[in-house]
């Protein structure tokens, strides 16, 4: 059973590791920059990052390895690929190497790194041989809710999108949502600004949207139809 850790506790853990990263690369909190998850995993945590085809249907995005083990992936043509992984390996599906997958790739690396952070800090509570992350956040591959996966997702989000960095990006982008209402439309300049924020931070639209909702910058779900869209295209 994974140790109970609140969102606030996970945020505090992330903050300490971000401080290590900033100190290592000479970054100041007064002029914050997003962490590069590959550099973070390698330089701060001492992890070995590999990119390999993990499955034929994309349901496995990444693996976290705590002890020597073998893994068999079945490719689209039916070929079976057997790999031997070592402790402190994190393996990302090579399909995420594409530029269009930057946000998903970065979050997956941060997610797998988060598993190692938790295993390092709480060795009696974490550290299964192989941990797989599926498409559905906060759930195991078999669809059952997983407390450990929620913690890894939350810690990953705190590493990539700490509050101080998001606030700096909000100021940089001149984002203004007085009522917390966002239209997912090019007619809303805030939507474009948030997309630019996501690109600078290196996360997906979904990730930055959820983070802004958690910070209560956005209230509720984005509305798909902007009033100007109705004027332009009709109801």
What are these regions (language model features)?
Residues 1-235:
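Active-site hotspot residues in diverse enzymes, especially metal/ion-binding acidic/histidine motifs
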């Amino acid at each position: 059973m994974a140790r109970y850790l609140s969102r606030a506790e996970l945020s505090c853990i992330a903050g300490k590791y971000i401080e290590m990263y900033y100190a290592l690369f000479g970054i100041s909190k007064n002029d914050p920059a997003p962490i590069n998850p590959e550099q973070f995993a390698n330089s701060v945590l001492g992890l070995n990052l590999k990119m390999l085809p993990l499955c034929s249907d994309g349901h496995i995005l990444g693996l976290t390895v705590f002890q020597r083990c073998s893994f068999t992936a079945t490719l689209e043509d039916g070929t079976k690929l057997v790999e031997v992984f070592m402790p402190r390996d994190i393996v990302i599906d090579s399909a995420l190497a594409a530029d269009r997958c930057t946000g998903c790739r970065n979050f997956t690396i941060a997610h797998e790194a988060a598993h190692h952070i938790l295993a390092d800090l709480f060795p009696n509570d974490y550290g299964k041989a192989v941990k797989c992350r599926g498409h559905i956040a906060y759930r195991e591959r078999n669809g059952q809710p997983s407390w450990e996966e929620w913690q890894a997702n939350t810690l990953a989000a705190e590493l990539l999108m700490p509050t101080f960095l998001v606030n700096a990006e909000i100021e940089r982008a001149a984002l203004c949502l007085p009522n917390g209402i966002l239209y997912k439309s090019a007619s809303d300049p805030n939507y474009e600004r948030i997309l630019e924020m996501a690109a600078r931070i290196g996360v997906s639209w979904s990730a930055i949207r959820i983070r802004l909702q958690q910070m209560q910058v956005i209230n509720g779900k984005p509305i798909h139809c902007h009033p100007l869209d109705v004027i332009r295209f009709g109801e």
